[in-house]
Swiss-Prot record:
Keywords from the UniProt entry: Coiled coil, Nucleus, Protein transport, Ribosome biogenesis, Transport
Coiled-coil segments: 258-319
Function description: Required for 60S pre-ribosomal subunits export to the cytoplasm.
Subcellular location per the Swiss-Prot or TrEMBL entry: Nucleus, Nucleolus
Gene transcribed to yield this protein: sdad1
Composition skew (Basic and acidic residues), residue ranges: 670-681
Family the UniProt entry places it in: Belongs to the SDA1 family.
Any Gene Ontology biological process: ribosomal large subunit export from nucleus
Protein name: Protein SDA1 homolog
Stretches for region Disordered: 227-260, 485-512, 623-689
InterPro entries given in the database record: ARM-type_fold (IPR016024), Sda1 (IPR027312), SDA1_C (IPR048292), SDA1_MD (IPR007949), SDA1_N (IPR012977)
Biased composition (Acidic residues): 492-512
Cellular-component GO terms for this entry: nucleolus
Amino acid sequence: MSGRNNNKLPTNLPQLQNLIKRDPASYREEFLQQYKHYLSVIEIFKLQPDKPNKDLSTLVMFMAQTAHCFQQYLEDFPEQLKSLLCTHHTVMDPDQRMTLCKALIMLRNKNLISPSVLLELFFELLRCQDKLLRKTLYTHIVTDIKNINAKHKNNKVNTTLQNFMYTMLRDNNAIAAKISLDVMIELYRRNIWNDAKTVNVITTACFSKVTKILVAALKFFLGKDEDEKKDSDSESEDEGPTARDLMVRYSTGKKNTKNKKKLDKAMKVLKKHKKKKRPEVFNFSAIHLVHDPQEFAEKLLKQLEASKERFEVKLMHMDLISRLVGIHELFLFNFYPFVQRFLQPHQREVTKILLYAAQATHHLVPPEISQSVLKTIANNFVTDRNSGEVMTVGINAIKEVTARCPLAMTEELLQDLAQYKTHRDKNVSMSARGLIQLFRSLNPDMLQKKFRGKPTEASKEARIHAYGELDAKDYIPGAEVLEVEQEKKEEPEEDDGWESASLSDDDEDGEWIDVHHSSDEEQQEMAEKIQAMPTEERIAKAATVSGSRLLTQEDFKKIRLAQLAKEMNNAPGKSMKRKNIEIDSDEEERSGELLSLRDIEHLHKKPKSDKETRLATVLAGRTDRKEFVRKKTKMNPHASSTNKEKKKNKNFMMMRYSQNIRSKKKRSFRDKQIALRDSLLKKRKRLMK
């Protein structure tokens, strides 16, 4: 009889639902019967909306499952559910409310309700004190907007929803406003709403009175794009000589100290130009989409000055302001005195504040303002009464500020800082060397003669531009080399070098690389011809070449090679090497938009750990280690234990009278005496030290 009871369709809704989906026309009467029952249950529910109604939940899910089969009868069904939720969502039972929301989600998935109407309702429901419901609605909102924009951007729906979210961010309910902000941030990160309007709506959240909303908005602007590619050290094979080519030339040439030094210098210059050639990676594209960064930064600074939030939130404010000022090159002169108040060695998170001070400087900051920041850092950090780490951090910060704003450095201060090159602390001396290296490329004339190093063509041309001066060129620097190359092509070519050379037999690719050793001589000859030309003649020739012909990739390659040679070749009349000049530094000039904390905190020599730190490291290493012996791995992990292992775990009383134990050779009494005497002598020697 139980099998026959399952066929009673009016009471067995799952079976009826299955049959309707297979053949809607045959079960139209049964469906209408359930629909009338649903209408009567709704009227009963409206009388007592605070009480759960199991029949209503079952019928609502049944109608949602079969709605696509009888759309003509269920035109008002989505609107009925929407009105129920709008009217009674505050008093409704949580399970009942969740069921109605799931039914609406099901109707939306079947495209039986417009997205804008449903999403506006769901944003209203975010005010409910129901964590599970809010999580479900958040997931659906993000997924639905993603599906709407899957094939193409639906600007009409996007505009409506963005306007609605703008009002939600100003809602009195903090939870609803926070989830609305989270939705926009998630859609931006998924590249669905990655337009300027979304970013500028999020900027309004940076001035929220609710700390959670404020922090979420600040983190959005301070974060990094997930799809941002990391800088790779891979070299381009067709962009001039690679490091591999240089190594081949050295390995196939004469091995002596002179060639080794030339190789090291060439590798450094190549590495530096690779960094310059690399495209700039924007830290976060959202900062570039802000409509009025000047006003935004001014409002943030005003909020920061009056803020009573935790110190971490204040740091986030300072970080965002410094990024806005540095990236957009804003004039926010009140920010620098505010930061200077925190530039003390004992200040909490002072390295981050130094980083923000460096980030906020750019070439348009007036020298008197940037010089005051530099003097504050020098007076508070770079003094002999501070530790070596503090002095190193200060010099690193000064270096980063001057790299972005060279006019901040005065000649007197630079000469004082350069004297730390011979400081007893390795970290301080290496930081000072890095600063000297920076000014060798910016303006060597500011350095004392003994710190300038061997002059090159590039350093001879280097100079710091005056405040507000534009360096607009009407020619391509280095283009003068093209005509020299054109003349050389008319001469007969001679192949004096080896045709090919390989790195080694166990090379990764197993390929042969053609290396013409005569190319070095050709480049040297070409460089000598250019060096012999006066500067005015070089510029005139470069302008003529730039304006008279279209340059090919091959031409640009030759120009890059010539610019590389400028940094390697000695200046005219300076071929003799001076002593105590060469200052080697691994620090390269950084040209990115943002700095990293490592640029400020970088120590060349790791400081010694104290006893507490070493002990903490030892104890941390012991937490995961169960045994103090190396565990022998078995060939087969599922194999049983050996007899030797079983003996170790066997009870001693079972082993006491075994033949192995009784026949075991033990130490004699005399051996024990000698061992005791030796140990006592060793202990006495240790105590006498």
